[in-house]
Amino acid sequence: MPSPYVVAIDPGHGGSPTSDPTQLWDPGVVVGSIMEKDITLDLALRLRTLLQRERVKVVLTRSSDQYVEISERWNRAHAAGARMFVSLHVNAYDGDSTINGLAVFYPKPDSFSFAQAIDSGLAETLKRFQIADDGVAIKPELWVRTDVPTVTVEPAYLTNPRERSLLLQDDFRDAIAMGVFQGMIAADPEIEQTKVQLAHSEAAATAQHLASAAATADAARTATATRWGLIIGGLAVLFVVMRAAIRRQSRLPQPPAYRRRAYRRRRSVSRRY
């Protein structure tokens, strides 16, 4: 069976304050009670669901509210054999709440086409929400250790009141996840090819399993029929033997009736005298 296509999804930031001052945590952008870390994790889980439906193996750099070092995030992706790396964030701009829009960043030139595919997917799914598309931009300081196509996605500004309101809505989050998903699928046709190969292999394995189960059932039925045949055959032989014995018994000579009566009469006479 072919190996699944592996991707890494990185929900930015994470962790919560504890009584241990040495325990690090990073909420990301915070506006009131809304924290970037919670939004990015939710987006990652939605995106994972979409990818898994396509038989893609998804590695999350974090799957709960925990702090993970940047180097460890990449180590987890690399150890799993990820062939794409998508880091999810939301944007912010201090001092001007009117700044808005979608942006996709990439760390190195070899990730440019990947960034364009992700940006195109998001621009399409967020069009109905009237989100401005700022396009793609290179940021060499981002994820410099990666050796696979890598992007950082900033779909909206948490500091913009309108976009903040959208970020709290399920349909907007679904649209973000769908846009990133469509961009990933478009970026590498091998994702779809692997899906087809896996589907064929699974179908063949299922057919083989069903054939094996049917053969086992046939063998069991044959064995049962054989056992019943032996039992019935044995009973038939026993019946024939018993019937022959009964017939032989019925052909044995019997004393005549008058002899039996005379014998009884003589015994009666002797008792009188």
Predicted features by range, described:
Residues 17-35, 92-120:
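A short, glycine/acidic-enriched catalytic loop
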Residues 1-74:
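Active-site histidine-acidic residue metal-binding/catalytic motifs
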Residues 110-137:
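Active-site-adjacent substrate-binding region
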Residues 41-44, 48, 71-74, 101-102, ...:
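Extracytoplasmic/secreted envelope proteins and their assembly/folding machinery
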Residues 235-249:
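Alpha-helical transmembrane segments
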Residues 5-8, 18-22, 80, 87-95, ...:
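Active-site-adjacent mobile loop/cap segments within catalytic or ligand-binding domains
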Residues 250-273:
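Cytoplasmic C-terminal tails of single-pass
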Residues 214-234:
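Juxtamembrane/start-of-transmembrane alpha-helix segments at the extracytoplasmic/lumenal side
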